[in-house]
């Protein structure tokens, strides 16, 4: 099946490129990227504790290389993009993946545009977090910017000089019980420009999470200063929670899907840029869909109890397995903590672009620090960087399975 998928993607995009006329602009473009990742496993956290009790319970993240090809093609009334990827990692067989990021048919009818297919629909303002990204629900703050995978949509848009309206039916064929970005939903956005301010309004009706509504603005206050904010209220939100009966060793994973009532998400931020192209971005946000401070405290207490149980005669394998299940908490929301502060410094030095950013979580003092350097040529790019966790030993960020990750990548554009 994997080879058939690869062949189908290559056939569709190659045929599209071959169909162009001699005097037309090339319809096929893309890039080829080779990336090396080096990871240092954390010595703290439930997975580290599980592996210490019973080696092999939770495999440590290994070093590896990834070869990624991104292909783009478009024609009159359609657009397609695809990703082909091969990944090698120490101790893991080579993995090959292929997918269409976008495969969409479009129709322009004056001020209206209609779309059907797999499409990237990215909404909202903000850099590190976007409360109103209700369709795409893109993962933010990745080490390297890659092409996201679109969602199945039926979409209608209306544009004029200073405003736009969008209506989307996302995941129309998926089951109602799907969660997160896979949930079937109806969504709408209105955009209005007034001078230097962009105003946004959003609404969403999920198959099982119900309604949500939000608003955002981005204001270019001067040549040097930009301010933005976004907020969203949700009727319900998908999350994970541990069973209240899980007070000791259990035989099955105690973490299960749950629903949060009436959470709120909000972000405020701004960017300052000087004449030397040095930019400082600062953002603060609240994510009511993340686990609460009380839940994280109970989580840490359970980790400590499970670690001590083998010394009291409990089966080592059972304690290790229960500790490994505790890592489910990392997937409860796109943010680990509800309150977050973010600072990013970048500078554009012609071909060179250094960047430094810090995510800080006031609830426990956890920190996530990233440093990167990018060089851009005409068709070539080279970049490298490192990301590391810091803070008190009991901070949630310090419990993640990877303590430090470094990477090097080279990209050729064609």
Region spans (language model):
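Beta-barrel outer-membrane channel/assembly domains of diderm bacteria
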Residues: 19-114, 156-158, 373, 385, ...
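Outer-membrane beta-barrel "beta-signal"
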Residues: 343, 381, 386-388, 400-414
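Outer membrane beta-barrel
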Residues: 71-172, 391
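Transmembrane beta-strand segments that form the barrel wall of outer-membrane beta-barrel proteins
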Residues: 79-90, 101, 136-140, 165-173, ...
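Outer-membrane beta-barrel strand-turn architecture
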Residues: 24, 72-77, 99, 108-111, ...
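Detector for outer-membrane/organellar transmembrane beta-barrel domains
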Residues: 193-196, 218-357
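Extracellular loop and loop/strand-boundary signature of outer-membrane beta-barrel proteins
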Residues: 51-57, 88-91, 138-142, 172-178, ...
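Residues that define the transmembrane beta-barrel architecture of outer-membrane proteins
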Residues: 59-67, 96-101, 148-152, 159, ...
């Amino acid at each position: 099946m994997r080879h058939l998928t690869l062949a189908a993607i290559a056939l569709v995009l190659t045929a599209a490129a071959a169909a162009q006329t001699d005097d037309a602009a090339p319809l096929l473009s893309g890039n080829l990227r080779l990336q090396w990742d080096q990871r240092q496993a954390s010595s703290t956290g439930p997975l580290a504790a599980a592996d210490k009790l019973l080696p092999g319970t939770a495999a440590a993240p290994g070093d590896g290389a990834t070869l990624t090809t991104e292909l783009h093609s478009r024609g009159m009334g359609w657009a397609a993009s695809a990703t082909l990827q091969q990944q090698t990692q120490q101790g893991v067989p080579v993995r090959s993946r292929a997918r269409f990021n976008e495969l969409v048919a479009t129709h322009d009818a004056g001020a209206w545009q209609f779309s059907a297919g797999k499409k990237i629909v990215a909404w909202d303002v903000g850099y590190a977090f976007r409360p109103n990204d209700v369709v795409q629900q893109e993962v933010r703050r990745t080490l390297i910017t890659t092409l996201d995978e679109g969602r199945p949509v039926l979409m209608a848009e209306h544009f004029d000089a200073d405003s736009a309206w969008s209506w989307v039916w996302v995941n129309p064929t998926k089951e109602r019980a799907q969660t997160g970005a896979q949930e079937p939903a109806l969504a709408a956005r209105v955009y209005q420009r007034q001078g230097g301010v962009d105003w946004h309004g959003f609404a969403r009706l999920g198959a099982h999470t119900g309604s949500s509504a939000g608003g955002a603005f981005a204001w270019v206050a001067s040549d040097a200063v930009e301010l933005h904010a976004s907020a969203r209220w949700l009727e319900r939100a998908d999350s994970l929670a541990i069973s209240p009966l899980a007070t000791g060793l259990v035989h099955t994973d105690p973490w299960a899907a749950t629903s949060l009532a009436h959470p709120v998400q909000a972000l405020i931020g701004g960017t300052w840029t000087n004449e030397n192209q040095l930019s400082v971005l600062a953002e603060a946000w609240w994510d009511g869909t993340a686990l609460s401070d009380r839940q994280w405290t109970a989580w840490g207490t359970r980790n400590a109890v499970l670690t001590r149980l083998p010394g009291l005669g409990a089966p080592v394998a059972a304690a290790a397995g229960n500790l490994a299940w505790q890592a489910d908490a990392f997937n409860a929301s796109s943010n680990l903590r509800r309150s977050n502060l973010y600072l990013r410094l970048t500078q554009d030095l012609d071909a060179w672009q250094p960047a430094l950013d810090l995510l800080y979580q006031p609830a426990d003092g956890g920190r996530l620090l990233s440093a990167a350097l990018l060089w851009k040529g005409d068709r070539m790019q080279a970049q490298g960087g490192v990301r590391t966790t810091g803070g008190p030993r009991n901070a949630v960020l310090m419990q993640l399975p990877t303590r430090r990750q470094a990477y090097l990548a080279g990209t050729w554009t064609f």
